[in-house]
Amino acid sequence: MPRVKGGTVTRARRKKVLKLAKGYRGSKHRLFKVAKDQVMKGRQYAFRDRKATKRNFRKLWIARINAAARMNGLSYSKLMHGLKLANIDVNRKMLADLAVNDAAAFAALAEQAKTALAA
């Protein structure tokens, strides 16, 4: 019985990798060996950066909340502590959105935080 080399399977696998490497520069989208390494590295970057995106957005929200809080006479930490004391459960994403799009509502929350801190 002759040896089976699996040509169609190999071709399909290589075609799949080269399709994933579309748009890469130079030989990284042409040659299978180089493309395979680059696709693997690209997927590592994608995995890492999915985690980093969450951190980056949290940092952005905190920076926006801090800027708006200081315009209302509070620091970020005082605002968050005051909101916790006032039993106002608003997450940072929503607070940052209020700070950017609805300054009056954010100012009202800041006032409630101030009264809770004073009490």
From Swiss-Prot:
CDD domains: Ribosomal_L20. Keywords: Ribonucleoprotein, Ribosomal protein, RNA-binding, rRNA-binding. Gene3D superfamilies: 6.10.160.10, Ribosomal protein L20 (1.10.1900.20). One of its GO terms (molecular function) is structural constituent of ribosome. GO terms for cellular component: ribonucleoprotein complex; ribosome. The keyword Endoplasmic reticulum does not apply. One of its GO terms (biological process) is ribosomal large subunit assembly. Disulfide bonds: none annotated. The keyword Repressor does not apply. Binds directly to 23S ribosomal RNA and is necessary for the in vitro assembly process of the 50S ribosomal subunit. It is not involved in the protein synthesizing functions of that subunit. Belongs to the bacterial ribosomal protein bL20 family. This is Large ribosomal subunit protein bL20. It comes from Levilactobacillus brevis (strain ATCC 367 / BCRC 12310 / CIP 105137 / JCM 1170 / LMG 11437 / NCIMB 947 / NCTC 947) (Lactobacillus brevis).
